[in-house]
């Protein structure tokens, strides 16, 4: 049996520029990705460069709380 909490957890990555700029004028919405991370290897918040469909460019997507 597993001891304690699960090592791999599901996280949500959200576009930082969409959140900072508010609602985009061309396309309203905020880009979000769902992925997994290992708590053992990356205990801090995860930030990845992903494609934002609303900004139409690669931007920083940061981990948010559920």
From Swiss-Prot:
Keywords: Chloroplast, Plastid, Ribonucleoprotein, Ribosomal protein. Its main location: plastid. It comes from the Eukaryota. It is found in: Plastid, Chloroplast. GO terms for cellular component: chloroplast; ribonucleoprotein complex; ribosome. InterPro entries: Ribosomal_bL33, Ribosomal_bL33_CS, Ribosomal_bL33_sf, Ribosomal_zn-bd. The keyword Oxidoreductase does not apply. One of its GO terms (molecular function) is structural constituent of ribosome. GO terms for biological process: translation. Belongs to the bacterial ribosomal protein bL33 family. This is Large ribosomal subunit protein bL33c.
């Amino acid at each position: 049996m597993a001891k304690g909490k699960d090592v791999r957890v599901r996280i949500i990555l959200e576009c930082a520029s969409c959140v900072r700029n508010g609602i985009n004028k061309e396309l309203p919405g905020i880009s979000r990705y769902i992925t997994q991370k290992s708590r053992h290897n990356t205990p801090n918040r995860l930030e990845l460069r992903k494609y934002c469909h609303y900004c139409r460019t690669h931007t920083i997507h940061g981990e948010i709380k559920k």
